[in-house]
């Protein structure tokens, strides 16, 4: 069966998560593989102790919620994302059909995406879906690509930008999208992944103990 990867990056939650919704609604994959990838050496070099602790606690919480909802664990991996996806794509045990993740303009995320796109150029049957409006209210790509777009510098600029995107209700509030519920539909979790990526498995609970 074809498998779709849910690559959690910046939205470590189940509710209001378009990446999760899009993957579960896709007809191109019958099983899912939920991943979070970190590089511990980079993480420790570029973040303080409190930020790292918060990330680990968030991963533990997401894992508990994922298990309660879908009956399986979030898979947390330590390593370079390009190496991990290469391992997944090269495995004969996995029929990977698509990868879902959130759109991001963070330099590290863009670099990881470009590395992944280079790998996928050799595996054209696997599609990468960058889902917008996960970490922002707007589709950033669409907004900045508009012909007359100028980066907002003041609150008045922000108000003008939002006025062009969202109508106001009778009380003068912007009518933005409602938060997405945790999907009721589900797919089986691909359960042979540990054999493929066992060298990268990471235990956030152990790191906090």
Which stretches of residues belong to each language-model region?
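N-terminal beta-strand-loop-alpha-helix module at the start
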Residues: 1-71
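General small-molecule cofactor/ligand-binding pocket signal
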Residues: 33, 73-77, 127-131
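Short beta-alpha junction loops
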Residues: 38-43, 80-81, 104-106, 131-138
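Structural beta-alpha unit
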Residues: 75-91, 118
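Acidic beta-strand-to-loop metal/phosphate-binding motif
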Residues: 95-109
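Short Gly/Thr/Asp-enriched flexible loops that form oxyanion-binding sites at enzyme active sites
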Residues: 109-118
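Glycine-rich, charge-decorated loop segments at or immediately adjacent to ligand/cofactor-binding or catalytic sites
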Residues: 135-149
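Glycine/tryptophan-enriched, flexible segments
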Residues: 147-209
């Amino acid at each position: 069966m074809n498998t779709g990867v849910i690559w959690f990056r910046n939205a470590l939650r189940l509710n209001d998560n378009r990446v999760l919704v899009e993957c579960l609604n896709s007809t191109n994959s019958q099983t899912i593989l939920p991943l979070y990838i970190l590089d511990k050496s980079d993480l420790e070099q570029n973040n303080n102790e409190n930020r790292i602790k918060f990330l680990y606690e968030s991963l533990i919480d997401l894992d508990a919620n994922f298990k309660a909802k879908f009956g399986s664990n979030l898979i947390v991996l330590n390593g370079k994302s390009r190496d991990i996806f290469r391992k997944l794509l090269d495995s004969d045990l996995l029929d990977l059909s698509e990868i879902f993740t959130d759109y991001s303009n963070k330099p590290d995320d863009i670099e990881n995406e470009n590395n992944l796109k280079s790998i996928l150029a050799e595996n054209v049957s696997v599609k990468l879906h960058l889902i917008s409006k996960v970490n922002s209210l707007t589709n950033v790509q669409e907004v900045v690509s508009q012909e007359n777009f100028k980066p907002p510098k003041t609150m008045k600029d922000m108000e003008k930008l939002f006025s062009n995107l969202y109508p106001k209700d009778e009380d003068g509030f912007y009518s933005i999208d409602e938060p997405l519920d945790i999907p009721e539909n589900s797919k089986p979790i691909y359960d042979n992944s540990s054999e493929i990526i066992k060298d990268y498995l990471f235990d956030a609970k152990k790191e906090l103990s």
